[in-house]
Amino acid sequence: MRIITINVNGIRAAERKGFFSWLKKQNADVVCLQEIKAQEDQLDERFYPSDMHTYYHSAERKGYSGTGLYCKSKPDRITYSPWQDINSEGRIVQADFGDLSVISIYLPSGSSKEERQALKMEFITERFMPHLRQ
């Protein structure tokens, strides 16, 4: 299985720079996207590759964070952030394929303020790592 992860720093900007032409050449089974910075209503058919199942998890705030997954095979299950208190930032989307889980995650920046660094570390140690062990 070929899995690619990429921070697109804005899916619309990436599209203008040839992202989808590049993607077609990769022959990926799953593509994890971080920092899509778009709401689904801002995305037309160009952002839904015809040969893949598309799952976006947008932040409520326009132009901010967000994650996505493109999957060749339809996952058995999709989960959009199991933690409701951070769901509004669109930071996690998970695809389950039998015993395999693929997670696209965009962690909070730890460089902006001490409070955000503490949030990032708490998220990793208290939430995400236990989630991975399940």
PLM segments and residue spans:
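N-terminal, active-site-proximal structural segment of metallo-dependent hydrolase catalytic domains
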Residues: 1-47, 64
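Short, flexible loop segments at the rims of nucleotide/cofactor-binding pockets, characterized by
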Residues: 6-13, 80-82, 119-122
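Amphipathic coiled-coil/heptad-repeat helices and related helical stalk/stem segments
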Residues: 15-16, 88, 128
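Alpha-helix termini
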Residues: 20-23, 112, 117
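Structured beta-strand-rich core segments of catalytic domains in phosphoester-bond hydrolases
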Residues: 36-37, 43-112
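A long, amphipathic alpha-helix that forms part
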Residues: 117-134
